[in-house]
A protein has these predicted regions:
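Short, charged/polar surface micro-motifs in flexible loops or helix N-caps
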Residues: 50-54, 61-63, 83-86
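Vicinal oxygen chelate
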Residues: 2, 89-134
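Short beta-strand micro-motifs in enzyme catalytic cores
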Residues: 41-45, 76, 113-117
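Helix-adjacent hinge/juxtasegments
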Residues: 56-57, 65-78
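N-terminal beta-strand motif that seeds the catalytic metal site of vicinal oxygen chelate
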Residues: 1-18, 75-80, 131-134
Length: 134
């Protein structure tokens, strides 16, 4: 397969307004396009950060989404590489977002040759922010 890039990840949510605010205001994604009443969904929205996109959508009318769990098969979290974990952590904290994952009593923790922290989006998606490639 000759892949050019990872195009997008689709995230479904029953907390659309909260999730949209999280991705645009906390993680600084750009809102590209919103479709209303898209294939039986109230909203289907495209968000972009650099070349990476998220398709944020509500459930189809009449469907009830199950809560996120790290025990599900498939993707467990997504990760963004940054220059400084500390700078990004402080920026998110100053914006008032507090849903950080705690490990060994710490919000930021050392792994291998760098640092990382994890936050939970309103719909449950776990997002890792790290400052080293592997």
């Amino acid at each position: 397969m000759n892949v050019k890039m990872l195009h997008h990840v689709c995230i479904q949510t029953e907390k659309y307004e909260e999730s949209l605010k999280f991705y645009t205001e906390i993680l600084e994604f750009e809102l590209v396009k919103t479709a209303v009443n898209f294939h039986k969904r109230d909203f289907n929205t495209w968000l972009r950060l650099g070349t990476f996109m998220i398709e944020l959508q509500t459930a189809k009318k009449g469907d009830k989404l199950k809560d996120w769990s790290s025990l599900n098969e498939g993707i467990v979290h997504m990760c963004f590489l940054v220059d400084s974990v500390q700078v990004e952590f402080e920026k998110i904290e100053k914006l008032g977002y507090t849903n950080f994952k705690i490990k060994n009593g710490e919000k930021i923790y050392k792994v291998e040759d760098g640092y990382l922290f994890k936050i939970k989006a309103p719909e449950g998606t776990e997002i890792e922010i790290r400052d080293m490639l592997i």
